[in-house]
């Protein structure tokens, strides 16, 4: 029987094998494949209307500033590259770079990579993340933001904090409601990581957060109600209440109360997207129906992972920071995702990457705990690693 040195055994179990890591090249390859699929396959069955309008300058100068910016970027790329698919690839590579940066900062490895891969391989995310449009720009900014926040938790550094703020500004500019939810997460995560230690349990802090949130809603309710009923809901109806195989003419949400009281069924409907009946009427939606189911169960699994994170700061960041931001994101998405399944898929692609943040944070924790002691910051990462292994 051959003796195996204990040091070799320890080294083998300390660092994950290279084949178990998610490489940045794989991320870029996935986005390139989605771009080619969207341009040469998907566009034959469903229009890439917004992407074509951006590249052709279809939106006039009277459009919003963010639409004008995307139009200028797209038309400039078309003028330089002369080929539509190359312009799509340019937007796709920006989104891929953001995701690759997040993967690098989180040191994604082992079982932590599977939820991210499941998301990257779903059509509801991949198609719109890989073509010209606001979605690919937002996803790139979100990837940079998530990577900077994970990196700041792992190694601190003012440059990461500033980078996160720049990416956050980009998200607020491109998609204000979703960007506002990310701003909430940024503030909560920063307070938990850098603020004073209050010595309260997670349950007590959750109750305090709920009380403060309820108080803020009560104080701001008149303005919030006017904004939702006077701007958000009419805009959503005007966007999508046109005849289409994927337009739900039977839905009509007119007041803030109707929006919040119907969340028990409108939220799952908006997240999943096409229903079986809509898929039967329009078979091209079948891959997106499957993707919607994957996203829905991934959301439930992510919530479970947040509460199962190692005790202390990691769990507080996820429960007190990520979970409220995710809730605000989903509620703000419902008016734009429930009326039209096809358009809702495009809107949802912006924030789907945020679903995998619990695994990114836990992957960074596990990878940091496995580093040699001389390379680690003086924090009790071994305690977190033991919690991950339980």
Stretch-by-stretch model annotation:
Residues 52-84, 266-270:
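Short hydrophobic/aromatic helix or loop-helix immediately within or flanking a transmembrane segment
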Residues 44-45, 49, 55, 175-310:
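Alpha-helical transmembrane segments and terminal signal-anchor/GPI-anchor hydrophobic tails
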Residues 68, 80-97, 288-293:
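Loop-to-helix entry region of an early transmembrane alpha helix in multi-pass inner-membrane enzymes
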Residues 126-128, 160-183, 187:
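Membrane-interface alpha helices of multi-pass inner-membrane proteins
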């Amino acid at each position: 029987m051959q003796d195996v040195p204990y040091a070799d055994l320890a080294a083998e179990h300390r660092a994950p094998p290279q084949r178990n890591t998610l490489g940045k090249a794989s991320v870029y390859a996935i986005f390139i494949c989605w771009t080619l699929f969207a341009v040469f396959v998907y566009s034959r069955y469903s229009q890439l209307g917004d992407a074509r309008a951006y590249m052709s300058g279809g939106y006039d100068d009277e459009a919003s500033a963010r639409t004008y910016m995307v139009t200028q970027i797209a038309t400039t790329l078309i003028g330089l590259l002369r080929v539509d698919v190359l312009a799509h690839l340019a937007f796709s590579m920006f989104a891929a770079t953001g995701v690759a940066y997040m993967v690098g900062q989180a040191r994604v490895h082992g079982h932590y990579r599977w939820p991210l891969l499941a998301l990257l391989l779903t059509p509801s995310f991949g198609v719109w993340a890989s073509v010209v449009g606001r979605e690919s720009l937002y996803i790139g900014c979100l990837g940079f933001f998530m990577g900077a926040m994970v990196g700041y938790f792992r190694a601190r550094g003012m440059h990461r904090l500033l980078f996160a703020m720049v990416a956050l500004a980009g998200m607020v500019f491109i998609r204000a409601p979703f960007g506002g939810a990310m701003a909430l997460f940024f503030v909560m995560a920063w307070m938990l990581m850098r603020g004073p230690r209050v010595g309260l349990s997670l349950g007590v802090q959750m109750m305090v957060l709920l009380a403060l949130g309820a108080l803020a809603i009560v104080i701001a309710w008149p303005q919030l109600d006017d904004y939702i009923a006077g701007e958000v809901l009419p805009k959503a109806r005007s966007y999508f209440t046109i005849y289409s195989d994927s337009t739900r003419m039977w839905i009509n949400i007119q007041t803030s109360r109707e929006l919040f009281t119907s969340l028990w069924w409108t939220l799952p409907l908006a997240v999943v997207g096409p229903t079986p009946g809509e898929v039967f009427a329009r078979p091209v939606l079948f891959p997106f129906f499957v993707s919607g189911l994957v996203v829905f169960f991934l959301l439930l699994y992510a919530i479970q992972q947040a509460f199962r994170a190692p005790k202390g700061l990691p769990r507080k960041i996820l429960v007190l920071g990520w979970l409220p931001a995710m809730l605000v994101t989903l509620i703000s998405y419902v008016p734009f995702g429930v009326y039209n399944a096809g358009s809702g898929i495009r809107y949802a692609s912006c924030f789907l990457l945020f679903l995998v943040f619990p695994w990114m944070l836990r992957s960074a924790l596990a990878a940091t705990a496995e580093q040699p002691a001389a390379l680690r910051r003086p924090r009790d990462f071994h305690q977190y690693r033991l919690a991950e292994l339980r």
